[in-house]
């Protein structure tokens, strides 16, 4: 063990500590990462079929799905999916009323509580921007969908603006439309028209779009343009104008989630995800009307999408084939998911397209998607990595229990630090301790756990051997500041989980501890485990 650890005491001048104050910030209010499964399976099944498989979602890493609601058209007797609002007949409250109990039961499940109701897909046949009747019908349908979502306790709606019908591009200006400036005004009007109904019914709705403002604007590189209107004119692009209409209608209490679908091309995880998240709030505003910029900054959230096919394809010449990282394709996924989870505001979404992968093992009487594989079937270790990245602190005891059950749990720190430590010369009031794990490998996951009494502050950081730990690199959420109520002995438990970034040449993990000089202040029961290494899968 001597080559693994170095326990030393240092001057306060060289250490950084984080103390978490609980006053005014109850843990239940903390924003946690939410993973949404966006595969085509859920969009081609019904709300009832999702509910029939809810138990499988409860056991999964996911928190929700977009739910495709199927209703009966009373005029034709045929079933329609409500999200085709521009193609379909009007969806009324009466048509969707019997789906409210189904939706309510769906979101009562742990693995589905963050689900959305699918509310808009681009039309199969392009609708003229001047067609008042069709847009008014679509707006009424959106209102009915939002009212059902609100009544069922669903967080919000899913909005898909991707052009699935290349010859019918709704958000591209065409010959026969009014001149571009007039059509841009109409597009903004239609965006407001549709979403005014949504927010009137559900003022705090979360509107999730795989392609939000940022995605569209980075695709066409408008950020450097001194005249965004002119830039959109040159590209015949009406989407930013429609999105401004959504902002016109949105209350300040709403959330507009930019799914950043192009994030599946972010392979330099720390840099690209961080830059993209900043762009959602900062640079995306350059494509927003001045009167909406403050609202845009307040209601916009950065999210990131994962195209899982890229991690399991065997054809190395395929457009989306991601090479291994440190010899592991799971390691590549872990690195990307870590970046997305660190820098998303709230949501990360995952999907598959061509590899016959679904979020769970479906069991449907119809047989649809039965027998398809899950990501963990195709990329062993996927589930473990997903649980670790979504909520490292919750994952820690689960992973420790798994390792113990398999006989593979080893406490790398075999003896106590000491129940009571005395103050050092450097500070008569506090004692500062540092523990370094010196032979860690890039991509590995480690977990610390100890008990503390009295005034104890602590933090885990990664760094490079011989260098100070990077100020950028606080790689645990939350810190390991002791939390929870004291036990019978007056001790509280502290847990910290750290993942070593893949670009470190000589990584070390540093646990920094500060103890009050009071005789009863101290730490004991110290545990350190190597939790996961993607290279072992």
Where are these regions (language model features)?
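Short carbohydrate-recognition loop motifs
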Residues: 414-435
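Extracellular carbohydrate recognition and processing domains
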Residues: 470-506
């Amino acid at each position: 063990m001597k080559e693994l650890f170095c326990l030393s005491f240092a001057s306060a001048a060289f250490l950084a500590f984080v103390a978490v104050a609980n006053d005014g910030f109850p843990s239940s209010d903390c924003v946690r990462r939410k993973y949404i499964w966006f595969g085509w399976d859920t969009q081609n099944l019904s709300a009832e079929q999702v509910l029939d498989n809810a138990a499988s979602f409860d056991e999964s890493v996911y928190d929700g799905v977009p739910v495709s609601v199927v209703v009966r058209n009373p005029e034709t007797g045929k079933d329609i999916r409500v999200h085709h609002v521009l193609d379909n007949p009007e969806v009324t409250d009466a048509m969707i009323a019997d789906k409210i109990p189904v939706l309510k039961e769906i979101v009562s499940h742990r693995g589905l509580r963050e689900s959305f109701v699918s509310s808009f897909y681009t039309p199969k046949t392009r609708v003229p921007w001047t067609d008042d009747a069709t847009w008014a019908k679509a707006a009424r349908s959106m209102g009915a969908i939002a009212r059902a979502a609100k009544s069922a306790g669903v967080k919000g709606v899913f909005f898909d603006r991707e052009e699935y019908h290349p010859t019918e591009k709704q958000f591209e200006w065409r010959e026969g439309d009014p001149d571009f400036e007039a059509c841009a005004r109409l597009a903004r009007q239609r965006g407001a028209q549709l979403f005014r109904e949504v927010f009137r019914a559900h003022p705090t709705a979360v509107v999730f779009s795989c392609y939000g403002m940022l995605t569209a604007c980075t695709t066409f590189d408008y950020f450097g343009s001194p005249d965004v209107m002119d830039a959109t004119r040159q590209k015949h692009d009406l989407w930013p104008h429609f999105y401004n209409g959504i902002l016109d209608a949105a209350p300040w209490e709403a959330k507009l989630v930019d799914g950043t679908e192009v994030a599946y091309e972010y392979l330099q995880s720390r840099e690209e995800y961080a830059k993209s998240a900043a762009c959602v709030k900062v640079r995306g505003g350059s494509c927003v009307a001045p009167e909406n910029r403050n609202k845009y900054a307040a209601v916009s959230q950065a999210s990131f999408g994962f195209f899982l096919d890229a991690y399991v394809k065997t054809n190395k010449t395929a457009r989306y084939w991601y090479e291994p990282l440190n010899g592991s394709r799971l390691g590549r996924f872990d690195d990307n998911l870590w970046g997305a989870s660190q820098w998303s505001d709230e949501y990360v979404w995952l999907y598959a397209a061509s590899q016959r992968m679904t979020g769970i093992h479906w069991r449907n009487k119809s047989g649809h998607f039965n027998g398809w594989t899950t990501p963990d079937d195709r990329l062993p270790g996927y589930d473990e990595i997903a649980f670790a990245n979504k909520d490292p602190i919750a994952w820690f005891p689960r992973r420790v229990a798994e390792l113990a059950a398999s006989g593979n749990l080893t406490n790398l720190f075999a003896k106590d630090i000491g129940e009571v430590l005395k103050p050092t010369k450097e500070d008569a009031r506090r004692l500062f301790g540092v523990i370094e794990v010196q032979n860690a490998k890039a991509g590995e996951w480690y977990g610390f756990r100890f008990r503390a009494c009295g005034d104890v502050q602590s933090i885990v950081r990664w760094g490079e051997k011989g260098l100070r730990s990077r100020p950028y690199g606080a790689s645990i959420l939350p810190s390991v500041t002791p939390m929870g109520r004291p036990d019978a002995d007056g001790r509280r438990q502290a847990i910290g989980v750290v993942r070593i970034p893949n670009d470190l040449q000589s990584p070390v993990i540093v646990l920094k501890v500060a103890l009050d000089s009071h005789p009863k202040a101290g730490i004991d029961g110290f545990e350190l485990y190597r939790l996961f290494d993607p290279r072992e899968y």
